[in-house]
Amino acid sequence: MARTEFQGSIFVPGDITIAGNIVPGISRSSIVQEDLAEYGVSFTEMRVHDALSSLLPATATADDLGLAGSTTYGTASPYLLSSNAGSTTVTQYARWQFQLPPEYVAGQSCRVSIHCGAGTAVSDGTMTVDVSAYLSDDEGAVSGSDLVTTSGPDCNSLTMSTKSFVVTGTTLTPGATLDCRMVAAVTDSATATVYFKAGRVKMLLDIQG
């Protein structure tokens, strides 16, 4: 097989077409790192936080967020909705697991992103959203404490916005499983109808490949 060797750098202003294989192969660690790549979390994969065999109810109840907007395909997309918190206090949860993909860079950035706000009217008190995340020990328990370092931010606005929660990545490795739970907390004194609403949840990761 013919072989041509080049010494030093090569600059190619156009495309390179390779008919065979790259030998030796390019290791994942040699690929440029992409910071905070987005991975969607499907609402249909979320569970009742204290009964993981149960999916979220269609209507929020007790301490569980509801999976709404799923009955009018082509008109509405699914979203999470709390119970009516008008003139009361509501604290409701949703839980999911997320396995870090092979391309995640061990020990690097990991975040949870939630796009949320008030559904119909703002509370005359408070509305916050928070996240906790624990690393599974792969034996039915968790390793360490809550990895989320971000305090629950205010989301009491009719203009929905994205809230970001930092997950400490020091002990995270590709293939590891995170057990995540979000909580919406609303306190209101005299408003007729007040709902927490979330339209998107994502995991953001530093990756290579």
Task: Give the residues covered by each predicted segment.
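Intrinsic low-complexity, repeat-rich intrinsically disordered segments enriched
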Residues: 1-64, 68
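Short carbohydrate-recognition loop motifs
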Residues: 68-88
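Short beta-strands within extracellular/lumenal beta-sheet-rich domains
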Residues: 84-109
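A short beta-strand element within beta-rich, extracytoplasmic domains
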Residues: 107-119, 199
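Beta-strand acidic-aromatic groove motif in beta-rich domains, primarily in extracellular
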Residues: 108-111, 122-133
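Extracellular carbohydrate recognition and processing domains
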Residues: 138-172
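Short beta-strand-plus-loop segments that form exposed binding edges in beta-rich domains
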Residues: 181-190
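C-terminal interaction-tip segments
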Residues: 190-209
